[in-house]
Amino acid sequence: MPMSSFKRKIKAIQIKIASPEVIRSWSGGEVKKPETINYRTFKPERDGLFCERIFGPVKDYECACGKYKGKKYEGTVCERCGVRVESREARRKRMGHIELAAPAVHIWYLESIPSVLGTLLNMSTSDLENIIYYGSRRVIERAFIVTDPKDTPFSQGDVIYETEYRIYRKKWDFEVEQAFVVKNPKSPVLSDIDGEVTLKTEKSITGREITWIIVKNITRATHTVLPGMILVVKDGQEVEKGQDLTKEMTIDPVYAPFDGHVEIDELSNTITLKPLTTSKDQPVVFTAPYGAKILVSNGQKVKKGDQITTSTSLPSVKSSISGTVRFGSNLNIRALEDGNFEVLSTGEVYVEQVIEERKYPVFEGALVYVNNGDQVKKGDHLADRFLFEEEYLSATEYKIFESHYPTMFDVEERTENDRPIVVITDIDPEVSKETGLKVGDIVTENEYEAYLQIYPEKIVADAGAQAIKKLLQNLDLEALQAEIEAELKKLPSSSSKAIKLRRRLKMVKDFLKSGNKPEWMVLEVVPVIPPDLRPMIQIEGGRFATTDLNELYRRLINRNNRLKKLLELGAPEIILRNEKRMLQEAVDALIHNGSDSEGKRSRRAVLKDRNGRPLKSLTDLLKGKKGRFRRNLLGKRVDYSGRAVIVVGPHLKIHQCGIPKKMAMELFKPFVLAKLLGEGSSSKTMRKVKKAIIEKEMPEAWEVLEEVIKGSVVLLNRAPTLHRMSIQAFEPKLVEGNAIQLHPVVCPPFNADFDGDQMAVHVPLSAAAQAEARFLMLSRYNIISPAHGKPISLPTQDIIIGSYYLTTVSKEFDSLKEEDVKWKFSSPEEAMLAYHLGFIKLHTPILIKVVINGEEKRIKTTLGRVIFNSILPEDLRDYNRIFDKKQINTLVYETFKRHGIDRAADLLDDIKDIGFHYATVSGLTLSLKDLKIPPERDEILRKTWEKVRIIEENYEKGFLTEEQRKSEIIRLWMSVTEEITKLTSRTLAEDPFNPIYMMVNSGARGNIDQVKQLAGIRGLMIKAYDPRSREIKSKIFKGQAIHEALTFDYPVDKNLREGVDILQFFISTYGARKGQVDTAMNTSFAGYLTRRLVDVAQSVTVAEPDCGTHEGIRAMDLIKEGTVVEKMNEFLFGRVLAKDVLDPETKEVLKNPETGKEYTRNTMLTDDDANFLASYKKMVDVVRYEEIDITELSLPNMYAEIAEPVGEYEEGTELTWDVVKAAKNEGKYRIKVKVYPVVGTVYAEEEPLYDKKGERQLLVYQEVINEIVAKMLEENGIEKVPVRPDIIVRSPLTCESEYGVCAACYGMDLSNHKIVNVGESVGIVAAQSIGEPGTQLTMRTFHVGGVMGASDIVSGLTTVEKTFEPYAFLREEKSGGKKEIRKYYGSESILCEVDGFVKDIATDESGRTVIYVEDYAGNIHAYKVPKRAKVRVEKGQKVLRGETLTSGAIVWWKLLELESEKGVMTAMNLLKIIKNAYVQQGVSIHDKHFEIIFKQMLSMATIVDPGDSDYLPDQLVPLVDIKRFNREILEGNAKVEENRKWVIGKTLAKRIIAETEEGELVELAQKGDEVTEELLKKIIEAGIKEIDVFEKDKVVTYQILPKEPIKYKRRLLSLKKAALNYPGWLSAAAFEETAWVLTAAAIEGKVDPLIGLKENVIVGQLIPSGTGLDVFAGIQVEETPRAAVEEELA
């Protein structure tokens, strides 16, 4: 069956911001209605969220109305319902869209940290939110009232707020008074006195009416005045008693002035003289004076000159009292020219004397209850109020009311208002210059209106998303880039403004580079995802369950439609604003319904369903464990799989598993069916018949199944899949029952046991998959762990006890002499016969002839040992050894090394069979009697309690402190516990066949600590604690031993065999609970650690056979604080040499005398090689004098100096070819030299080497000896030194492959002990190797012993976490501009910056300890010790660069700065710390796995000087990119001259902006201009280094000036940061912070080159690793029929 070869279809994936046009192009139509389906017909509503016209048909190849049915109409669009006839699969692909009635901002770009919109527009997030959500600004300000508007559009009395007033005042002339706001006026207005009311109205300064209610209590004198009298007083005039009110006067008679007739009006006492009709005279009216007699009668004719009245005299009227004159209301008077009044009729003039008066001003609008002249009583209501609440009064008005109504109202001088804000989107340049405003400034609505009145049509401001859109549209990114770059040149690079500007510049460049337009961050169109991705299903009771997204879309459509309607109706702005805000919130909720990524609550309300559960938005669909990335793209479910409980299969071979028949039939059903159908008919009837055969389980079905599974393999997986050995391939064997049978030896890699564990089965389908599974994943090829290169599939428990029982002997065996042995046999067969006949037992001592290394020998042994050795390879047999767990492990490993993986696998099977058999034969049982309690125990305890009593007495007497008492007791009980443990072990060992002793001693189950608790003493118990608690930290700082702080000082002195009392039981519960809690908490933590490790390292594969580097790392013992963490042989194992290993004495390539192997560069080191090199050392001369012949063509192969002057070269100069040349010029043929053989070797003694005086260390262990040190040794008379070769091995850390590592730098594939294959996923293997044992690294019970520093506190997982997240445990404190980093626990460790000697440790004036280090040149370096740190060095001690001088945390960036560019020293320090944590738990992991992780953590660098790159200072950039850029710069600089000639005559593809010397930006050339020599010269002079030109319709960039390379600084990143800074955005988005990663990538228009494994799994193509490499892409795979011989073997 030939298979087509695969090709990688997708090369890269780019992410960009979608423009409205792109969103519309995706769409199948606009969704206009919020409806989903019709609840009567269950069909989707037209134009709704499930519309068939937009998204495709619900039924396969059938339109909505049913007119077109069947595949033949595919592609037809129904003219009746508008639905395209196609597969219903379309409903998973086709999208819709919603046209928004108003723009809405995409929430990701607003709420990202830092905010993209905020950075680009140079606005704070809070301001942006206020603009977008139509927010307001709280303003506390004064108000003013216009008193004189002059020539302005204001009216008198208009209120203007201070902000507006400042704006108006600059341009307009008008007068104002400060305004006061009335608060709490008391009402109504009551009269304080009895009296009469007078009302008076007047206008205030602001043009508003004030009514004065005047109440007077008065006495009144009435004076009658008569017609004709002349009043000499005015109304309101003050008069004294007796003063004249009228004149005393004589009135002359009245004569007729013309002819006419008289009319007399007695009522008004007037005489009217009317002229004749012929006359031109006018009628005249006379008042008849009081007392004068009228001489004519009514109607009488008179002649001119006739007397009409007689003369009379009128006395004066005098005032009877002092007071105010008031004219009576009936008084009829006429004003005279002299200011007096003539009385025309009788009336009254009053003189009022005011006893009491009150005035009540009332503001306009108040209701006055009284009228003029009304009499009121005290307490009567005059008006409903005098002022209104919130009334604005001018200063003058305020004074009036304040003087009349003190304490009856309050005022506010300043008002507090929430003013809606707007952002300026356009402004006239002149106005901008005048006002200082610019586009993007935020003003309140009042301010905007003020500006608009002054500068009509010259300023535009707006709020909401449309305002942001306008701002983004107005951005000229190219000009902005030039402007920011110009500003950055003027600023110091470390200033906060420069950092902010650089961030902004990066964003501008990203937009320019990606071709994204900033306004696309504001949505005009919202895409609607396909309906099958947000399904709606019917549930019981006829109701429908739907995805939250549908609810979010429904809200959005409802609000959008409502806004459209309001816009059509021309609704008021305030309603529209509210509706737009709600629309924005609906879009926000759809995209991201909830608080932002940092946990800071958003200002938006979270939309919830009726149960109060937040609705899941599009962001929730992507992020987290249940998001699209991790659940659907990276965690697909697979078909052809099953799951069942596992049971042990003792009869199976290591590569076999038992599959239940039913399960196998289901898994292989299609294959069985195909086989049953055979070549014959595949008609429907035949298929049904054959299916029935399978379903009814007829005998034929089982026969065919047996045939089908022959030669197949299946994959077994046990969750949690912590490493690659958790999935292995097995050949299936059909078994009865329902459980999968598993070979017991493969339990350790699966971490499986048979207490109810379940395993999953998967069937590889294709021939290629079967081949891969068989050759790569079969369990017999996976017995060696890729984590450490030792066997992992190993016998356990019963098998171990069986083998141990078989090979163990009685106590007398060793002392029995050969001649005393009763039984002697000539062959193993003879011995077996004797055993079966019952003459001897398995453990009876016998003498037997066996073949050892080809020779027949007679040995003393037992039959058990003979039986066991019979299954071993001949060269590994040992008849005098007990085979416990450790021995069996060694045996399997040695078999693998000597005889290969297949023989090792067969041996495991044989051990399994023999172990199970003899475990059964042993009849192992357990009884209480087997727990032997040491007889001396009681006496030891009695003495100990006596010692405790003495300590307590000393404490009570005051000889000991509380801490000392506790410490003494704890140490006492610890030593006693140790003593009893040894006794218990010794007591049990008295009987080698004691079941408990056999179990513990063989390593089958349990350990001596458990036996100690069962039969000896439980000992001291630990308290439950939190390592981060203040109490613990304070104890550390006090220097108290931490184990003492956390231990009960009362022991459990009983054991479990005899039982404990109640108090001891309760003390025990602490430790028991702690164990449970730690395990539970650490499991999830270890899982998270593994996940971070995988994410960091997943793209590291073996990229090439050899990168060619000569760099490497120095092989050494890893020593942490005096403890050897890892021996050099372990360090060397599996490595490849970077340089030849030279013999320290001869300086020739070292050769292994046993194997004859030479250790040249690129040699891979096996176990034996590592052991040889690690143990190889020699005593070598420090110096020797030689005379060399310079006529030879070579110099000495070791460091040499001339021992006599040669030409210009003095004695002591290094011997070089230049020196030889000078000697030849002098005619010399031989010169004396001093040769230093020790230079370039490594000091190999653990004890330091001291100088003559014994004061100063000259050499320390593992120090590489250089010429300076060699001369010191010479000066101190040291002749020979023990040294070993300097071994430099290749490492992933120093590998120079651009992606991943090369095979030579990685070295051995630990799972097969061969050089690693190209394509191996070494990153994933590294992450699994480190993460898999994570659960074992629980918080450990602390070391026993002396006072410990902070380093001893937390080991295990916390140490691992601290190493992989180095900055999570450091706190930055800025003081005086410097960064000071403090440790999470304790202080910072001081690093030595030079090689030298500790000259002195002294205290300075301030009391601080100072370490003085003298370097080789004699310079002194002083290091101040932090207060809480402990000095780790002594006077005279030798210290090397990068060593720690004090306790505390290493500040990694300081260490990185100290070393070379590679970061090796930092990595080795990290390695020591982390290895220590794993070694303490007995976990073995090869260093190279850690190195791969550290390589990834060191894969980024911070830009110090960007040179001519687009990067910014302090930007974090992958090291690979920097190196590639610098390489390209060197290549580009070489082509500058050539490019200058080439661009002449080409057309510019971009305009060119440059900065003048004055700092102004000028345009040198437009897009489309031709490049002339003159223009090119201008461009070059302006310092522009590259230009874009058109070349055959393509834009090509040419470099025309040399460029500067990037200068950078290596960075050590935490795991999380390294994963988030991964070059491909797909993997980073699937890791954490999905929204932010996608946002940043979209802005940048980032291209994911799909180099890692995760990215390729996400896009659904073969991973670029192993057989997924392009090398294998063209391979054709086909199945061939198996040969008959093969069939038989199978």
UniProtKB/Swiss-Prot annotation:
EC main class here is transferase
Tell me which GO cellular component terms the UniProt record holds: DNA-directed RNA polymerase complex
Q: What does the UniProt cofactor note say?
A: Binds 1 Mg(2+) ion per subunit.
EC number(s) recorded for this UniProt protein:
2.7.7.6
Key words, A-Z: DNA-directed RNA polymerase, Magnesium, Metal-binding, Nucleotidyltransferase, Transcription, Transferase, Zinc
Give a GO molecular function annotation for the protein. DNA-directed RNA polymerase activity
Query: InterPro entries from the xrefs?
Result: DNA-dir_RpoC_beta_prime (IPR045867), DNA-dir_RpoC_beta_prime_bact (IPR012754), RNA_pol_asu (IPR000722), RNA_pol_N (IPR006592), RNA_pol_Rpb1_1 (IPR007080), RNA_pol_Rpb1_3 (IPR007066), RNA_pol_Rpb1_3_sf (IPR042102), RNA_pol_Rpb1_4 (IPR007083)
Q: Which residues bind Zn(2+) 2?
A: C1107, C1295, C1302, C1305
Residue sites binding Zn(2+) 1 per the record? C63, C65, C78, C81
Q: Which reaction does it catalyse?
A: RNA(n) + a ribonucleoside 5'-triphosphate = RNA(n+1) + diphosphate
**BP-aspect Gene Ontology terms:** DNA-templated transcription
Ligand binding (Mg(2+)): D753, D755, D757
Per its UniProt record, the required cofactor names are: Mg(2+); Zn(2+)
The record's listing under Pfam families reads: RNA_pol_Rpb1_1, RNA_pol_Rpb1_2, RNA_pol_Rpb1_3, RNA_pol_Rpb1_4, RNA_pol_Rpb1_5
Record bears the keyword Lipid biosynthesis: no
Outline the subunit composition: The RNAP catalytic core consists of 2 alpha, 1 beta, 1 beta' and 1 omega subunit. When a sigma factor is associated with the core the holoenzyme is formed, which can initiate transcription.
- PANTHER family hit by this protein: DNA-DIRECTED RNA POLYMERASE (PTHR19376), DNA-DIRECTED RNA POLYMERASE SUBUNIT BETA (PTHR19376:SF54)
Described purpose of this protein according to its UniProt entry: DNA-dependent RNA polymerase catalyzes the transcription of DNA into RNA using the four ribonucleoside triphosphates as substrates.
What does the similarity note say?
Answer: Belongs to the RNA polymerase beta' chain family.
Please give the name of this protein: DNA-directed RNA polymerase subunit beta'
Q: Which organism is it from?
A: Thermotoga petrophila (strain ATCC BAA-488 / DSM 13995 / JCM 10881 / RKU-1)
Q: What is this protein's gene name?
A: rpoC
